[in-house]
Swiss-Prot record:
Its cofactor is Ca(2+). This is Probable pectate lyase B. Binds 1 Ca(2+) ion per subunit. GO terms for cellular component: extracellular region. It comes from Aspergillus oryzae (strain ATCC 42149 / RIB 40). Ca(2+) binds at residues 133, 162, 166. It catalyses: Eliminative cleavage of (1->4)-alpha-D-galacturonan to give oligosaccharides with 4-deoxy-alpha-D-galact-4-enuronosyl groups at their non-reducing ends. Its main location: secreted. It holds the Pfam family Pectate_lyase_4. It is an enzyme of class 4 (lyase).
Length: 326
């Protein structure tokens, strides 16, 4: 489908640069109104974001904040480069979509106690801890993070920045797909505390599909209590540790690969109880898996099967497709 679109644009370009721009804008608007079709965010009625509402384009922090926090369904297209120091509270029924080449620097997005949110094709970086995570999902349902580029700053102190993508407080029906997480101390936390079992147990159903983790120190991801499916992920040049399975989490890791990583690829640490993992066609790249085998299997997942690329294809494929590539 994308190949056809690219060929069509190439043909038009010969005749009219203006038509090319218009065609690209139209393609972006179509993609911005697509609903989630992969993983856990297809459950519970699905995830459509702001598709039922109007579409607006924003070019500055004030307009982005106003649109994201509004109470009506809305598709928000981010154009250009937005910089600032802020924590935006995203309301329900929102799609926030980045145009190709757009970026957001220093601004965190807080998705708390809402539902039906899509964050797509966004490049977000250098969010200081005072502004939360680059994307924080807290006590929310039906959230899709797709084709995002999330980064930090390894030259900063470990606690100067928080997570790139944290999912906490019994959040449900979340998919993270085609996303590039890189150059950061703490990438992605599922379940924030060992003491939160009463709230988190039975929740935190999350899919990580087709993601690229590069130059990350830890939490790639770190999982407490949740039910998490990881498929077609690539970890390259991790600085510390990989997938931490903790506090009775049930994890299924399929069709994935590690490269140039330290010893602990799939492991348990820093909690009272271990988590569990079923590991199927994963190239550990010389690293290790020390987690007890779990019970989560592909046949037990409630959504349509995600095509497994095969561990041998991951290193060549995922870096080319993950990130702000729409």
């Amino acid at each position: 489908m994308r190949v056809t679109a690219i060929l069509t644009l190439a043909t038009i370009a010969i005749a009219s640069p203006t038509k090319v721009l218009n065609s690209r804008n139209e393609l972006a608007r179509r993609q911005a109104t697509e609903g989630c079709s992969i993983g856990y965010c297809t459950q519970n009625g699905g995830t459509t974001g702001g598709a039922a509402g109007d579409t607006v384009t924003v070019t500055d922090l004030a307009s982005l904040t106003e649109a994201a926090e509004s109470e009506t369904p809305l598709t928000i297209i981010v154009s250009g480069n937005i910089e600032g120091s802020a924590k935006i509270r995203v309301a329900s029924d929102k799609t926030i979509y980045g145009e190709t080449g757009s970026s957001i620097t220093g601004v965190g997005f807080y998705i708390r106690q809402v539902s039906n949110v899509i964050m797509r094709n966004l490049k977000i970086g250098q969010v200081l801890a005072d502004n939360g995570d680059a994307i924080g999902i807290d006590e929310s349902t039906n959230v899709w993070v797709d084709h995002c580029d999330l980064s930090g700053d390894l030259s900063a102190g470990k606690d100067d920045l928080d997570g790139l993508l944290d999912i906490t407080h019994a959040a449900e029906w979340v998919t993270v797909s085609n996303t590039y997480l890189h150059d950061h101390w703490k990438a992605s936390l599922v379940g924030h505390s060992d003491s939160n079992a009463d709230e988190d147990t039975g929740h935190l159903h999350i899919t990580y599909a087709n993601n690229y983790w590069y130059n990350i120190n830890s939490r790639a991801p770190s999982i407490r209590f949740g039910t998490v499916h990881i498929i077609n992920n690539y970890w390259d040049s991790l600085l510390g540790t990989g997938v931490n399975c903790r506090m009775d989490a049930q994890v299924l890791i399929q069709s994935s690969a590690f490269s140039n990583c330290p010893d602990e690829a799939i492991f348990f640490a820093d909690s009272d109880y271990t988590g569990y993992a079923v590991v199927d066609d994963v190239d550990l790249g010389g690293s290790t898996n020390s987690v007890p085998e779990g019970t989560l299997t592909a046949s037990s997942l409630p959504y349509d099967a995600i095509e497994a690329l095969g561990s041998a294809q991951i290193a060549a494929t995922i870096p080319e497709t993950a990130g702000q590539k729409l």
